[in-house]
Swiss-Prot record:
Source organism superkingdom: Bacteria
Protein transport listed as a keyword: no
HAMAP family per record: YajQ
GO molecular function per UniProt: nucleotide binding
Family according to the record: Belongs to the YajQ family.
Taxonomy of the source species: Bacteria, Pseudomonadati, Pseudomonadota, Gammaproteobacteria, Pseudomonadales
Name by which UniProt lists this protein: Nucleotide-binding protein PSEEN4469
Keywords: Nucleotide-binding
Free-text function comment from the UniProt entry: Nucleotide-binding protein.
């Protein structure tokens, strides 16, 4: 029986490259030169932005988003927290989200069921497995999911006949 998985994954090397590019871009900006830093924590997949003022944090966040787009990483996976003061500096944390949580998985399953396609969707941890009798039905399900807007970037992998 043909099937595929709906997942939300990040290429960690591309994320690292995007953060490195953002650091280089920050050094090139004369208005932010020496006034802000990016600190990337690989294990937690977080970036700590540090600057003197809050508007500089916003500019740094925009630099990071542009670097992600250049590396073809969807910006929807970046979750930012509110800026906070730490001594004379302002700090903000940005986390890269990965995997499909329960609420999003339920939305995906509901979208597929509302589409009245001849496929079944089942939640399996941080992914959704979609099975059907024909390959064409699965391709319709992929097309349906691509038309909908979700709060995480979705990838379709493990396509089996």
């Amino acid at each position: 029986m043909p099937s595929f998985d709906v997942v939300s994954e990040l290429d960690k090397h591309e994320v690292q490259n995007a953060v490195d590019n953002a650091i280089k871009d920050l050094d090139r900006r004369y208005d932010l030169k020496g006034k802000g830093t990016f600190e990337f924590k690989d294990k937690e997949q977080t970036v700590l932005l540090t600057a003197e003022e809050e508007f500089q944090l916003e500019a740094m966040l925009e630099i990071l988003r542009l670097a992600l787009v250049k590396r073809k990483i969807d910006v929807k996976c970046l979750e930012t927290k509110d800026p906070y003061a730490s001594g004379k500096e302002k700090k903000q944390e940005a986390k890269f989200r990965e995997g499909i949580d329960k609420d999003l998985a339920k939305k995906i399953v509901a979208t597929i069921k509302d589409g009245k396609l001849k496929v079944q969707a089942a939640i399996q941890g941080e992914q959704v497995r979609v099975t059907g009798k024909k390959r064409d039905d699965l391709q319709e399900a992929i097309a349906l999911l691509r038309t909908k807007e979700f709060d995480m970037p979705l990838q379709f992998n493990n396509f089996r006949d």
